[in-house]
């Protein structure tokens, strides 16, 4: 109890500490990574009725099929969203909610079309091999090209599709650092 009181006493004063928005996310107990325009529109209507302020389209929005190991390019699936992802984002906004999407910007799936087209220095490396966990490579943000890729993804989502909220997730455990251009894996974290 005392530690909680102390933490609350030193916390900065700001509106975001007082009023957290109500966010609907379509993943848990709902679409489980299988979003489509047809499935999303009725959920958006119900989320609005329930008083939600944000609506997040979770994983799968970028893949025609199994989405887990195809992450990384972050281009909307035309099969899932025949009218485009922007159509769904615009519908969310028309209901007075902030549209959002799920991302794991720090990874690229082993089946992502871009994964084999970029040089190895985009990834954490150990013992001369790309580090991966659960079918995903860990991106190395020391590389300016990786930063440019991430910036381009965010810019596109915001400017082309009207995304106003990003749920940033992290679902792998790649271990400590990279040995590429470093004396040790830990040194590779220092940039």
Identify the meaning behind each predicted range.
Residues 19-23, 53-56, 96-100, 163-167:
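Structural preference for beta-strand elements that scaffold enzyme active sites
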Residues 29-117, 148-152:
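Aromatic- and glycine-enriched glycan-recognition loops and surfaces
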Residues 25-26, 70-71, 135-139:
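A short, mixed-charge helix-start or loop-turn motif at secondary-structure junctions
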Residues 13, 30-31, 77, 186-190:
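Solvent-exposed loop and edge beta-strand segments that line ligand/cofactor-binding
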Residues 1-15:
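Beta-strand-rich recognition/accessory modules
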Residues 12-13, 45, 156:
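Short, flexible, glycine/charge-rich loop motifs used to bind or transfer phosphoryl groups or to couple energy/partner
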Residues 80-84, 88-94, 116-191:
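Active-site neighborhood of glycoside hydrolase catalytic domains
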Residues 17-31:
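Boundary/entry segment of secreted carbohydrate-active catalytic domains
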């Amino acid at each position: 109890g005392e530690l909680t009181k102390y933490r609350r006493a030193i916390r900065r004063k700001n509106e975001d500490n007082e009023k957290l928005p109500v966010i609907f996310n379509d993943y848990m107990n709902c679409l489980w990574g299988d979003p489509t325009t047809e499935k999303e529109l009725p959920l958006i209507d119900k989320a609005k009725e329930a008083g939600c302020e944000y609506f997040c389209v979770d994983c799968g929005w970028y893949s025609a099929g199994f989405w887990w190991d195809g992450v990384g390019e972050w281009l909307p699936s035309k099969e899932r969203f025949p009218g485009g992802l922007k159509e769904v984002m615009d519908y969310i906004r028309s209901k007075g909610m902030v549209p959002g999407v799920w991302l794991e910007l720090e990874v690229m799936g082993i089946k992502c079309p871009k994964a084999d087209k970029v040089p190895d220095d985009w990834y954490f490396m150990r013992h001369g091999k790309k580090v991966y966990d659960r079918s995903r490579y860990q991106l190395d943000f020391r590389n300016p090209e990786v930063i440019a890729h991430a910036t381009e993804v965010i810019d596109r989502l915001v400017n082309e599709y009207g995304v106003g909220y990003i749920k940033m997730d992290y679902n792998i455990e790649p271990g400590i650092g990279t040995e590429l251009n470093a004396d040790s894996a830990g040194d590779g974290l220092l940039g």
